[in-house]
Amino acid sequence: MFRGKIFVLSLFSIYVLSSAAEKNTSFSALFAFGDSVLDTGNNNFLLTLLKGNYWPYGLSFDYKFPTGRFGNGRVFTDIVAEGLQIKRLVPAYSKIRRISSEDLKTGVCFASGGSGIDDLTSRTLRVLSAGDQVKDFKDYLKKLRRVVKRKKKVKEIVSNAVFLISEGNNDLGYFVAPALLRLQSTTTYTSKMVVWTRKFLKDLYDLGARKFAVMGVMPVGCLPIHRASFGGVFGWCNFLLNRITEDFNMKLQKGLTSYAVEYDFKDAKFVYVDIYGTLMDLVKNPMAYGFTEAKKACCCMPNAIIPCFHPDKYVFYDFAHPSQKAYEVISKPIVYQIAKGLA
């Protein structure tokens, strides 16, 4: 059933994007916040073990060069930005990097691989927390003002930009780890995650953000790393972890619906991005989309130290990240959803 939904929405997205003007007129820029699903290289400049700037990452990227993206090529940030007719690549925003004026005006990425909406997750992995990313966005605004020179123009760019957010994947992954169990139930924790997400969105709103595309959590129980640790020789998904994920996603979706009518978020628009359902459809029906492997990773696992020859045939490139091809497939209905919901 979901497969048909992806197919129909893909046709709609092709029509919408092809019938639009050659240059995007709906969105001024795209800003990405969150974790490794969106990180385009910010962790390169951090003292953390979570990096994607070495072989075999980037094998399908331009010049086959690792950039810090956690995958074989472009990541979800890049693919959504291109689908929305903004630009093909979204650079990582690091305060020690020089970014062109054009990139400053059309969007950058603040996401950090390993980040969580729970500060403890980010501190444990020594990556940028949600609060750190907000601080970086404030710093970015100063640079944008120097480039644009007009406050009104800065406000227009930010208010008409898509704020793409992916948080929660690492929080839920580490919540079930015995060493990091909190003294609370999973339902209590997922409710707290929604509260933290609201604060994060409000911080961005107060800085001018108005168009939010907020991603749910992936089916983390079906990631290769959890299949290997939970599923044994059969490679089963961790159904418990998926249930916790579904609980959070349901609460997040309800929260976004309520935020849209709150005075605190006046004039803001929210789209819930169902990456759980779209990615799960690929996991359950890989051959329908041209994939031959949905359980194992192409690389970076004990049973796949050397990368596979055809990453486009794998749903997952490494232990926890979809391949570029998988991102391209699931992005089609999502781009249509964002374009329609935030226009």
From Swiss-Prot:
Subcellular location: Secreted, Extracellular space, Extracellular matrix, Pollen coat
Coiled coil location: none
Known glycosylation sites: 24
Family: Belongs to the 'GDSL' lipolytic enzyme family.
Enzyme Commission (EC) number: 3.1.1.-
Species lineage: Eukaryota, Viridiplantae, Streptophyta, Embryophyta, Tracheophyta
Tissue specificity of this protein: Flower buds and pollen.
Encoding gene (name): EXL6
Cellular component GO terms held in the UniProt record: extracellular region; pollen coat
Residues of the signal peptide: 1-21
Organism expressing this protein natively: Arabidopsis thaliana (Mouse-ear cress)
Gene3D superfamilies, sorted: SGNH hydrolase
GO terms for MF: lipase activity
Primary location recorded for the protein, binned into one broad class: secreted
Protein name in UniProt: GDSL esterase/lipase EXL6
Phenotypic effect of disruption: Reduced pollen fertility. Pollen grain exhibit a partial formation of coat and impaired water absorption and germination capacities.
Location of the active site: 36, 318, 321
GO biological process, any: lipid catabolic process
Assigned keywords, A-Z: Extracellular matrix, Glycoprotein, Hydrolase, Lipid degradation, Lipid metabolism, Secreted, Signal
Function comment: Required for the formation of pollen coats and male fertility.
InterPro entries: GDSL, GDSL_lipolytic_enzyme, Lipase_GDSL_AS, SGNH_hydro_sf, SGNH_plant_lipase-like
